[in-house]
Amino acid sequence: MAELVGPLRKQLADSLSSCRVLVVGAGGIGCELLKNLVLTGFKNIEVIDLDTIDVSNLNRQFLFQKKHVGKSKAQVAKESVLRFCPSANITAYHDSIMNPDYNVEFFRNFQLVMNALDNRAARNHVNRMCLAADIPLIESGTAGYLGQVTVIKKGQTECYECQPKPTQKTFPGCTIRNTPSEPIHCIVWAKYLFNQLFGEEDADQEVSPDTADPEAAWNPADAAARATASDQDGDIKRVSTKEWARSTGYDPIKLFNKVSALSQTSPYLFKDDIMYLLTMDKLWKKRKAPLPLEWEEINQLGSQEQVIGSGLKDQQVLGVQGYAQLFQHSVETLRSQLKEKGDGAELVWDKDDPPAMDFVTAASNLRMNVFSMNMKSRFDVKSMAGNIIPAIATTNAVIAGLIVLEALKILNSDFEQCRTIFLNKQPNPRKKLLVPCALDPPNASCYVCASKPEVTVKLNVHKTMVQALQDKILKEKFGMVAPDVQIEDGKGTILISSEEGETEANNNKFLSDFGIRNGSRLQADDFLQDYTLLVNVIHSEELEKDVEFEVVGDAPDKAPAPSAPEEGKNIANGNKDSAQPSTSSKAAVEDDDVLLVDSDEEPSSSTMDTESSNRKRKHHDAETDDASSKRKRLDQQPADDDDEDIIALD
């Protein structure tokens, strides 16, 4: 009979006490995980998290208290755990896991790595570091009632990046400024307006009508002419929005009536700005034209205003007059905050700062009204503006428990028993909330864990700069941290160097300036990640508007056409206003893979052939997943399009 130490066999208990574990993230899942680890018998734990504790964390991250607000999550989590398990050996790092100090050798110090992260970039990085160090990684995520845990092992399972994930949703500037069609467009505009008035000004966050919008011009020459007209007509003196606001003493009524600050006789925010947009009549051939607002008319509404909805104040939708008054009150409060900070001070928008949140709520709803959209409650605006998806403490607790169970299998040398486990919102037809699935084998075409990672990128070599190649393609798209790029031209030309000062002069040059053309090959190396990627360049002058590059086949999955995932992804973003989930966070969504199945255990998806495409649905990464984009089994009833189907990884 096996000797037991508590509920565990002695051999396994000894393994727990001697093994070193790295926990990446000390938030919702991380707090539960640290507690579970020490209570299970793990002694040597290192935890890293760059974040500090926020008031909004306290309802579910139980290791933190109000007195800890503003302090390091990792450090406070360590101190809290040691209070009920002083024998544990815990090291805390208040730092980013992407810091070069945490290199492959650092990862090789551990027998297990456990992710409790909330963003894709860090997940990608840890995935690559564990592959390079050949250390098992237990990946996890939650969103509302949904959750998942999976195990990643080099050469035996899919890595985190084996399956393609939809890119983060962004919006063209002309859509935000000229033709908003969804509430999120108005919310983004309102956040831009906050920065233009009270924060750090950014030329990319302009809120006035985009006179150079190509769609508004009858021919391309008109767009160019409009773009320069305001600088050429007469002695117009251009002033910034903030300068004009200061000159008025941040008068709320004047701010309501004026925003674009194209001149000292600037257009009005909800009236003349809109009147100007109406002169760009080509925009409204197939769209409903906006309806200008005027402060005096709104104040005449009086008792006609109604509040929509009942219950908590934040969940009520006010009328136009209510939001106009909220706009006035928030501006007065923000003006006082600026005055207290002194000359030259700036405010930073924070979803947890009531006046800042009130301002964005009011301004965005007034703009929604102008463009004939259903207005939103403060709760809904906050959900979208702050990319917030409600987190549930019990879901985090369940997922953290599953992480430890998978860890025990690995330490007990039972890797073949490891599973990807999904926590569903409702029981499946077999009345199961927790559904285990066999781990998938590596994807042979994965651009991360394949034996020779390779991708093909379509771009315009005459318009793509080296800086864009580095930042948008290699870092943002392919998750590199510090890439070095060499052109395979027989001479070994260095295009990008991670060493500071070596190739900065190349940044503002076009790829064609270095002889890169259709068919050129680039070798990109990230020595921190011990990762090499071969990039095949396809030159194209026919990319869609606002698209700088395309990954052919949407690597690593080369089967679907590029337009297919785009169509699915845009279902929700193109919804009519009335069809949108009340807490939908459509601004910036990231995605994580989750399988919704209806059997006690499913085989590896790689053995399902065509059926797999109907069985898989995407369980989105952060803080944000779109219910309407999820693929369901053909024989399955449609799931409710519910708020909690939005995915945030906590």
UniProtKB/Swiss-Prot annotation:
Disulfide bonds: none
Family listed: Belongs to the ubiquitin-activating E1 family.
Keywords: ATP-binding, Cytoplasm, Isopeptide bond, Metal-binding, Nucleotide-binding, Nucleus, Phosphoprotein, Transferase, Ubl conjugation, Ubl conjugation pathway, Zinc
Residues that bind ATP: 25-30, 49, 57-60, 73, 96-97, 118-123
Knockout mutant characteristics: Knockout animals show deficient growth, microcephaly, microphthalmia, mandibular hypoplasia and abnormal fins.
Domain of life: Eukaryota
Main location: cytoplasm
Designated name of the protein: SUMO-activating enzyme subunit 2
Pathway where it operates: Protein modification; protein sumoylation
GO biological process: brain development; fin morphogenesis; protein sumoylation; regulation of cartilage development; regulation of neural retina development
Residues annotated to bind Zn(2+): C159, C162, C446, C449
One Pfam family matching this protein: UAE_UbL
Cross-link Glycyl lysine isopeptide (Lys-Gly) (interchain with G-Cter in SUMO1) placement: K237
Compositionally biased spans, kind Polar residues: 572-586
